[in-house]
Structure formats: structure tokens, C-alpha cells
Amino acid sequence: MLHNNTAVPPLLEVSGISKQFSGVMVLKHIDFTLLPGQIHALLGGNGAGKSTLMKIIAGIEQPDKGSIKIDGNNVSHLNPTKAHQLGIYLIPQEPLLFPNLSVQENILFRLPKHQADKARMKHLLELLGCQLDLNANAGSLNVADQQLVEVMRGLIRNSNVLILDEPTASLTPAETERLFTQLRELQQQSVGIIFISHKIPEIHQLADQVSVMRDGGIALSGKTCDYTTDDIIRAITPAAKNKPLTDTEKRWSELNDNPQKTSSDLPVLTVTDLNGEGFRNITLSVKPGEILGLAGVVGAGRTELAETLYGLRPVLSGEIKLKQCPITRLKTVQRLKQGLVYLPEDRQSSGLFPDSSLSWNICSLTHNNRTFWVHPTYDATVVERYRQALNIKFSHINQPVKTLSGGNQQKILIAKCLEAHPAVLIIDEPTRGVDIAARNDIYQLIHNIAQQQVAIIFISSDLDEVVQMADRVLVMHQGEINGELTKQQIDVDTIMHIAFGEHKSQQAVSTIKTDKAASC
């Protein structure tokens, strides 16, 4: 790990950056510095503000307040082209390559002739110790090599600030180590690297400096060696309210004709040997009132499984039963009528009608049950019930849903799902992009829904969130269930080991316990 001289002028210096969307402060007076040859890790839960900060540095978003210095010079009105010219390159979590173009064509794409130097490109590859076939189609590369092509696109453009967003999310341990070797080579070339990750062991292995964001601010910042894993986890994890919902906030279950009133040991949903697009051999069950966590890295097949259960993707083989009745061949609308409801990950494109009113959105799943025509008086009653039950903040029921904050949009989506009378509710990344106050509201709401004997499948990439919420966890790895954890076994380290295929569940639990005992 490189030890930098603090007298060296920073490559990047961010001071007092603030930003708000729809009245919600997503960045609050952020200070952030990157030195030459430094790997500065950035961590934080979903909605902490990491992506917004990086988009501002890369010129994709404009700050409301604050200043940015690059190589000691103040810059303003950044856009992506200007950021590239100043040496800043953002490498997204999912590489954005042209799959039908060659590796060389992708690296040199849209470069002016004086920069499209093939000899220099080959020299950079040699410096990094890479063995890429420049003539191969980019679509034929594995994810690790695709990310390397993105790194090369930055370097060939003379970038000295590289921003890597969750670069190891879909990599095997061997691919991760190869990437780290190449990043250390870049350190020796005085390239500064912002490394966004939620994997704390990787941070200790790689980074010189660490900053943790929470609720739009910097909760911790300093030399990585000065902080333990527990220090970082405490900085990341939001402080839960641990306050039960009021009687008014529980009103949805009293008024909404909840179909499942009593507890039962019989599973309400059973899946047997299910195969589909992106997953295989899935067997699971969930009981009324149970929160079943579904964990795994990006690409593990969690969302594909959820969409298949809901009928959005085809079943290749296997069986799905809801309340002991086969639904494998039923269409989505039929599964919905039977009580299987899905709250999708992307609320903007899949869950909500952004330009439509609150009332239309909340009642949209049940309009066909009452004929397709809207009933304003009835809809107003429904909206008012959920306003009180979920503490939704809005001005008028005809207000377009896109004008609400992210947290209130998510509550509208939850209300829409509850109005469909779920027996099973599949929730995919429910707190992505919402602020800390709304996040804690949503945690409490999900617990309350489960208390009404609704079975919940809870999908989240935020492992602390999974630990906090789930009664039981299934961990997916490369499209299969790699392990099951009971409530007593659930912790972040164990989930991570299983999610990356290092251990099966029982082996992971015993290994983690041994490691913790040895460190005491």
C-alpha cells in the first residue's frame, strides 16, 4: 500500500458540496480529497449520497453549493466532456462497452487521432501486466476483463483520477485479486483512485484512505489503518428508531381486508426445483408473517428469480405453489389476484407511473377489479387511509408522483402493493435511493406488514439491512442458492463468504466463528 506525502497537492479537492433533489438534501457540505497515487475508499449504505457525489465530480450533476479543485485549480460548470479533459474518468459498476466492437475499438472509441495511439495503448497494457486480446469482441470478455477495458479507456485519455463504482460486485475472488494487482500498478503511476465498495475486508486490503457517507454527509474519514471493521460498520449503519408504529400507522391492516389474519406453520409460497433465466435449481418456501431475506452479489439471479415468481419471466422448469395451489402456468395478473405482489427494484420505470397522480398510482393494481374506470371518491378515501398509515407527505392527491421525494415515492409504491391485498409480498431493494428518515420508516412498515401475517421475500444488496430485517436468509451465488442462514446465524461476514462462493452456509458459519474466536 502506497504511503503518500501530504505535502503533494491533491489531484482532487471537493469543499462544501451540497445538493438536493425534490426538496430532499442528498449531499450536505461534503469535503473530500484525493492525492496522487492514493486509493481512497468510499463506503455507505444505499441512499447515503455516494453516487450523487461521484456524478458531481464526473460532471454528470451540478452541485447547489461548494467548490471543486482539480490539480489545485478551481473548476466550475463541469460536464462529462470537461471532466474527461481534466483527467477524471468514471468507471460504472456495469461496464458500458460496445459488445460487437473489438477491445481495441472500444478503448480508442471517439478519441481524436493524436490520442488514438495504438503503441501507447499496448504500452499501458504491458505496464498493468494485462494479456487482453485486442482483436476479441468486447462481448466475449468476462466481467473482470470488461472492467479492465473501461480502465484502459480512462488511461488512454490521460486520466489521473479514476472512479470505480463497486468494481468487484460481480467478480470471483481470483478476478478481484487480479484487479487489485492492476490498481496497485496504477498507484505507482501516481494515478488517484476513488474506490466505491461495501466490502470492508477489501477496503482494509487495498485502500490508503477511507471515507464513509451516511445520510448525505461524511460520517467517518481518515487513514484506513486507523479504523477497525467495527468502526466502519458503525459509521455505515443507520441508527434505527426502534420505535413501534402508532395505532394510526397500523390502520392499513384494520381497513384493508387483509386476507391472511392468522399465523400458520404451512408455507404460503413454495418453490420446487425452479429453473429460469439467470437461475437454476431453486427450492424455497416462506411462511405467513416471515421475512425471508434473499442476499447475493450483483448478477446472482435474485431479481430474475423475483420476476419469474411474479410471472414477468418464463419458467423453464419446476413448480410454484401459492397457498398450496399451483400457479406455475398462471399469468402475472392471475398471480396478482391470488395474492402474489411484487415491489420492483426500479420504481421509476417498473413500479410507478411518474407523470400520473398519487391516487392513480396507489389504486392502479386494483382498478380492473372495480372496472377500469377511476372512482374519485373511493380513490380519495384509499389515498387518505395510506397517508395516515404510512405517513406519506404530499400536497394533493392529484399531484404527479414524480414531484415527491424518493422516500415518499417508495411509500406510494408500498401503498400500491398493500392495496392489492398481498398474501406474499416480494420486495426488491426497498430503500435504494431514499434518505435515512424514510429508510427507517420503511423498515418499520415492513415489520408491521409481516405482523399482519403477510409473507415477505426481502431482496437487498445492503447486507446490514438484511441482517436487521430478515428472520431467515437464503444466499444466492451464480444463480443458485448457496446457503441458508437461520436468525441466529445471520451476520454480514457469513453472508459475504457464502455470496462469493467461498463456503457453503454451515462451513461459512463455523469458519467465521473460528476466526472471531481467534481474534478475541
Curated annotation (Swiss-Prot):
Its main location: membrane. GO terms for molecular function: ATP binding; ATP hydrolysis activity. Pfam families: ABC_tran (PF00005). Part of the ABC transporter complex LsrABCD involved in autoinducer 2 (AI-2) import. Responsible for energy coupling to the transport system. This is Autoinducer 2 import ATP-binding protein LsrA. NCBIfam families: PRK15439.1. It is a peripheral membrane protein. Belongs to the ABC transporter superfamily. AI-2 autoinducer porter (TC 3.A.1.2.8) family. The complex is composed of two ATP-binding proteins (LsrA), two transmembrane proteins (LsrC and LsrD) and a solute-binding protein (LsrB). Its EC number is 7.6.2.13. The gene is lsrA. It comes from the Bacteria.
